[in-house]
Amino acid sequence: MRTPIVFAATLLLLAGSTFAQEYVEFKSQQDRFSIVFPAQPKITETTYTSEFKSVLPARVYSVDQGQSHFKVTVVDYTNIQAIAAEKAKACPPGAEACSGNTGSGSSTGAGYWKPDIEGAVIHATWELMQRPNEKPLYLGWTNMNLVEGHMVNLVNEKNKSRTSAAIYMHENKLYIIEGTVPAGYPVPDFFQQSVGWLDANGRDIRYLTIYHNGFPKPEVRTQGGAQGGYR
């Protein structure tokens, strides 16, 4: 789901605002995404604590202009199994809720790594909705270039600022995309709606059917229009 007409119209509405001075189509080959920022983002290495308390490597791309804030947090779940298993070693004996179950038919795995990765989008969505003074106005399913995710709109009940966010899981990486603007500004849907996905060669891709993380990847169409298996 990518709406170029709505996106372009929103940019025109924002053209007179203080943060809409120079738009940058930013691409991260390292994290395989593209997005339109209002300026070159600052990149910060950090960590992210998952629902079941595994500490994962993360990277934050951010732009702050006045009271407007734009941010993409990318959390790498690639090594969640090993990280959770290491965490589980410190659990008290018999504390299954901490250590998980390593049996072949277990739904948890060591340190609950299985529900951690499967529920990453839901957990990140819940965390957004639990922020102090933030009231959810909308929560729904969405997709961007056929990668499925959640879309959330929030209003701050104190200062009336608006946040438009989207959360996706692609290639075992969690993407939390947030745009926040002051009261009276157009809702910044344009930011999360401008996200795209890159292949190993840095080309923009669009899946031909819905992409579900953890399932076999659908065929893709690259920027040049060629079709074929994802490489």
Positions of predicted regions on the chain:
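Hydrophobic helical h-region of N-terminal Sec-dependent signal peptides
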Residues: 6-13
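N-terminal "mature-domain start" segment
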Residues: 20-58, 136, 144-146, 202-228
